[in-house]
C-alpha cells in the first residue's frame, strides 16, 4: 500500500427497496415492448425510429434549430445532424435561414414530412387505443398523468450536455 495516498473507504451501496426493483423491471419490460413496437411499425414507412422521433419533434415543435432538436432527443449535435440529413434527402424536412440569427438554421417539415408524421402517428395511436380499451377512462387519465410526471422526473436527472457515464446525480 502506498502511504502517500490516502486510504479510500468505499461504503457498500444501500440495498434497493423491493418496490424500486419491481418498478425497474416493469418499466424495462414496457420500454422493450415499445421499442420493438416502434421499430416494427415505423420500419413499414421506410424511416428509422430516430428519424421518426426527429420528424415528430419538427412537426410538433415550433421554430426548432438543430441544437434544439438534439437537446429534445438527447442526441449529440453530429448525430442529430445526420438524422436531419436523412430526413432532408427523403424530402421530409428542410433547413431554412433563421430570421433573427444568421448563423443558425430552422428545421421545417415539408408537406410530405407532415403527411408522413400524421400517417405514422395515426397508426401508433390506433394501436394505443386498442391497448387502452380494456382500462377505465379514469385509469387511463391517471396513467397518463403518472407517466408524464415520471418522464419529467427522469428528464431532470439526465445530463443532456453529453451524459455522465457511470455517475448518478
Label the predicted regions:
Residues 2-6, 85-148:
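Charged, amphipathic alpha-helical coiled-coil/dimerization segments
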Residues 1-16, 138-169:
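C-terminal regulatory/oligomerization modules of transcriptional regulators
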Residues 31, 56-60, 121, 148:
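Short, locally clustered residues in the helix-turn-helix/winged-helix DNA-binding domain
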Residues 36-79, 90:
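N-terminal helix-turn-helix DNA-binding core of bacterial DNA-binding proteins
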Residues 44-48, 79-82, 86, 136, ...:
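Short glycine/proline-centered loop/turn elements that form peptide/ligand docking sites
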Residues 1-45, 49:
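N-terminal leader segment of winged-helix/HTH proteins
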Residues 39-43, 129, 155, 159-162:
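Short, flexible helix-adjacent loops and helix caps
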Residues 34-37, 61, 116, 123:
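A short secondary-structure junction motif
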Amino acid at each position: 500500500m502506498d502511504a502517500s495516498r490516502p486510504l479510500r473507504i468505499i461504503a457498500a451501496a444501500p440495498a434497493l427497496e423491493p418496490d424500486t426493483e419491481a418498478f425497474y423491471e416493469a418499466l424495462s419490460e414496457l420500454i422493450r415492448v415499445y421499442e420493438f413496437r416502434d421499430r416494427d411499425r415505423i420500419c413499414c414507412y421506410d424511416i428509422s425510429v430516430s428519424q421518426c422521433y426527429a420528424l415528430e419533434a419538427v412537426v410538433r415543435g415550433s421554430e426548432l434549430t438543430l441544437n434544439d432538436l438534439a437537446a429534445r432527443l438527447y442526441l449529440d449535435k453530429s448525430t442529430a445532424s445526420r438524422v436531419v440529413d436523412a430526413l432532408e434527402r427523403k424530402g421530409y424536412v428542410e433547413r431554412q435561414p433563421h430570421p433573427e440569427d444568421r448563423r443558425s438554421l430552422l428545421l421545417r417539415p415539408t408537406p410530405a414530412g407532415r403527411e408522413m408524421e400524421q400517417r405514422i402517428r395515426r397508426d401508433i395511436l390506433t394501436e394505443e387505443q386498442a391497448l387502452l380499451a380494456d382500462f377505465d377512462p379514469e385509469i387511463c387519465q391517471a396513467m397518463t398523468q403518472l407517466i408524464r410526471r415520471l418522464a419529467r422526473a427522469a428528464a431532470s436527472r439526465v445530463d443532456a450536455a453529453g451524459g455522465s457515464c457511470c455517475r448518478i446525480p
